[in-house]
């Protein structure tokens, strides 16, 4: 595995006038209720994790779980109370204001739920604005902005004002603006939550297309589990500032680490989450169906075909080599069973 782009070690964020004193006295054993009784609010409680280059980590939880606070700490929009945060090996908490500004300008892109477009500027002018703030010449910034317009599919609307765009189009401008500075790291805090379901689905598709092309290192905040499942390489589920579980979507659904995670995921349609590789067993040498299926297929996409087979189905890798098998009964049990572990 490559070196982490983002690394957090025992990060705490506690709000309140005596937060540091209480944290010191707690010696790492932070109880949210006890702190609240003493006038402090626990935003992030002992968060430790890494995000590698090109990975998309989706952080999710209910309102007040600490997911947005965690993101703000990692971007240092909010200072952590305690802990270590590294960006490409650089200790974020030791940077002075000038160094922090340079880091944000050159390595970080941010997109929030609020589009925050400048109403008196056109699409291309909004996208070019952060480049001009960096000191890039006007024409060069416009040229770069036009590249971003095409990237997010707004060709022909570059001279529109924000009021002339739909919500989804405005959010595309926000995404293009954040990408214009070519950030290595992309922070997104519920960027699609204000959009209606159809536009939201379109934006998720667009987002996946961009990520496949650009391979950014991403932290994405959402409270929507379906959205997390569609987008994430790994998911972190938070409750009361604590990361309850950080794992692949499949492992979170199949092997919840806590009762809270189990309840969080119990209504998730497994067929939409799991891949054939998550279910396959050792390959049978005989008695296989003629039908073959890739280990990377989402179960929902191939379940109907597998269920028409009487025998186990061969599972293949990228080179069409048989690496396992899956029986139709396994599909039935996984997709339709509601047994509780």
UniProtKB/Swiss-Prot annotation:
Function field: Part of the ABC transporter complex TmoXWV involved in trimethylamine N-oxide (TMAO) import. Responsible for energy coupling to the transport system.
Domain ABC transporter: 6-265
Keyword Cell inner membrane: yes
Bilayer topology annotation: Peripheral membrane protein
PANTHER family on file: GLYCINE BETAINE/PROLINE BETAINE TRANSPORT SYSTEM ATP-BINDING PROTEIN PROV, GLYCINE BETAINE_PROLINE BETAINE TRANSPORT SYSTEM ATP-BINDING PROTEIN PROV
One example of a Gene Ontology biological process annotation: glycine betaine transport
Keyword line: ATP-binding, Cell inner membrane, Cell membrane, Membrane, Nucleotide-binding, Translocase, Transport
Location within or outside the cell: Cell inner membrane
Protein name per its UniProtKB record: Trimethylamine N-oxide transport system ATP-binding protein TmoW
InterPro entries named among the record's database cross-references: AAA+_ATPase, ABC_osmolyte_uptake_ATP-bind, ABC_transporter-like_ATP-bd, ABC_transporter-like_CS, Gly-betaine_transp_ATP-bd, P-loop_NTPase
Record flagged with keyword NADP: no
């Amino acid at each position: 595995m490559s070196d982490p782009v983002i690394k957090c070690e025992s990060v705490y964020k506690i709000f309140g006038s005596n937060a540091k004193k209480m944290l010191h006295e707690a010696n790492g054993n932070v109880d949210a209720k006890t702190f609240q009784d003493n006038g402090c609010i626990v935003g992030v409680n002992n968060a430790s994790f890494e995000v590698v280059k090109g990975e998309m980590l989706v952080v999710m939880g209910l309102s007040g779980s600490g997911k947005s606070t965690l993101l703000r700490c990692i971007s240092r929009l909010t200072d952590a109370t305690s802990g270590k945060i590294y960006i490409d090996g650089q200790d974020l908490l030791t940077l002075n204001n000038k160094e922090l500004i340079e880091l944000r300008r050159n390595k970080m892109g941010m997109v929030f739920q609020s589009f925050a477009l400048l109403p008196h500027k056109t699409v291309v002018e909004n996208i070019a604005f952060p480049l001009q703030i960096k000191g890039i010449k006007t024409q060069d910034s416009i040229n770069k902005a036009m590249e971003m317009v095409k990237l997010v599919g707004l060709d022909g609307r570059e001279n529109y004002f924000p009021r002339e765009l739909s919500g989804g189009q405005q959010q595309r401008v926000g995404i293009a603006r954040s990408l214009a500075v070519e950030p290595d790291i992309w922070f997104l805090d519920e960027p699609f939550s204000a959009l209606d379901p159809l536009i939201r689905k379109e934006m998720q598709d667009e987002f996946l297309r961009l990520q496949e092309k650009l391979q950014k290192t991403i932290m994405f905040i959402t409270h929507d589990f379906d959205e997390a499942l569609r987008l994430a390489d790994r998911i972190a589920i938070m409750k009361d500032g604590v990361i309850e579980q950080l794992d692949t979507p499949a492992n979170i659904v199949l092997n919840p680490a806590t009762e809270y995670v189990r309840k969080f995921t119990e209504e998730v349609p497994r067929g939409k989450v799991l891949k054939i590789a998550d279910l396959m067993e050792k390959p049978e040498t005989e008695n296989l169906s003629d039908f073959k299926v890739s280990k990377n297929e989402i179960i929902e996409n191939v379940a109907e075909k597998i269920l028409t087979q009487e025998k186990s189905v061969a599972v293949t890798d990228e080179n069409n080599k048989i690496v396992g098998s899956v029986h139709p009964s396994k599909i039935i049990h996984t997709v339709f069973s509601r047994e509780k572990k």
